[in-house]
Regions:
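Acidic (Asp/Glu-rich) sequence patches and key acidic residues
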Residues: 1-117
Length: 117
């Protein structure tokens, strides 16, 4: 499972969010261009999530919900892409959506193709 969080104006609906996410993903994550460092709000969101669960690269007790690491490596510019283990995806995605919302960031579930509240 994955969850996407980005900085910017909230899209009007789920379809707009899906298009916006695709554009951001292609521009910042799935590109041959040099990596763009994450903007401060995205870095802060990742840091807040890592306060609750360890980065996969530091997880000695198999308690991390992340399926790749380092987690900040999934961020570029105004976007972060959170790959999660299925066994912890429900809890981790709910918490990540809550953290993102508290920081004024957008959150999108690409599996359901829906904005998260």
């Amino acid at each position: 499972m994955t969850l996407l969080v980005w900085e910017g104006k909230r899209p009007a609906d789920d379809a707009s969010a899906a298009r916006y996410f695709t554009d951001l993903y292609d521009r910042y994550i799935d590109t041959e261009e040099p990596a763009v460092p994450p903007v401060e709000p995205i870095a802060a969101c990742v840091a807040a999530l890592l306060e609750r669960w360890p980065d996969l690269t530091e997880d000695e007790g198999d308690s991390s919900p992340w399926s790749t690491g380092p987690l900040i490596g999934e961020a570029g510019g105004p976007l972060v892409y959170f790959p999660m283990r299925w066994s912890m995806a429900e809890e981790a995605s709910a918490y990540a959506a809550e953290v993102a919302a508290s920081m004024g960031l957008n959150c999108f579930d690409p599996q359901a193709r829906k904005l998260r509240p």
